[in-house]
Amino acid sequence: MEIRCNLCPRHCNALRTDTEGLGFCRSPLIPQVNLIAPHFGEEPVISGTHGSGTVFFEGCSLGCIFCQNHKISCGLSGNAIPMKAEVLADRYLELEDSGVHNINLVTFMHYAPEVARSIEITRALGLKIPVVANISGYEEVSTLKMLDGLIDIYLTDMKFYSQAVSSELAHAPDYFMKTCLATDEMVRQTGDPVLDGQSMLKKGTIVRHLMLPGYLFDTKHILDYLVSRYGDKIYISLMNQYTPPAELMDKLPQRLTRTVPAGHYRQLTDYLMELGQTNAFIQESDASGNEFLPQFR
């Protein structure tokens, strides 16, 4: 099979086949999976006590220059396993049998048609736990609509507010506009957050924002927008875990070669509370570091 791909906002119109991809994500049509394992580094309502059943896909349509998963996001590593929908569906069931709280699909939207089919198959085979779409936020609404009724939880990002910042750090000047439209669609699909008896999220949308050193005003604008637009119809997760990847240090702007100062993070968590947001997650002061990073192949 081959297509001219326009799944993401970059609209490459690039040729993609089952084995080759010439677009920005550099990915073929068949999903390339690097790692499948329980993961304990997500928000408490996702990871719980048994972990989130995480499937890490290779490639990415955003390509932030500071990505902590750059080993698998900047093109293909050479270590991925191609998995069609039927194989993925079986892997989800194996994860469910291991006792995880949910199936957590990480950075898969460039494979959306095949992943959507995998969810349909696994549901038909009896999967009962929630399916989480763990994505960058830089999505096309038309592609998200392929997942309508299949995704229980969106775990998404709102990374940048300023056009100048998103251009500098992800070569995506339209990031904020596209992400606002995409987030509206995610919230429409999931509705308000719903917790089960163990305080695990069954349905809803979590919007993450990773604070970056030197970009406080971007963070403030994003919090203003999210609270005014959605309030407690979503969870806001304000993160301070940014750790400059050692392998990328020579390519990063100077301000991104350090972590977020603790005082800056406290300032913004206080601001989020002042805005009146109740559904929120904040991190401990020592959240930066590599201990929660997956061990990719």
Q: Which residues does each predicted region cover?
A:
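Anionic-ligand binding region
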Residues: 167-197
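Conserved radical SAM core fold
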Residues: 73, 112, 137-140, 158-176, ...
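Non-cysteine beta-strand/loop elements that form the S-adenosyl-L-methionine
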Residues: 148-165, 233-241
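Short glycine-enriched, charge-decorated loop/helix-capping segments at active-site entrances
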Residues: 71-81, 168-173, 251-259
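Conserved Radical SAM active-site core
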Residues: 26-153, 162-163
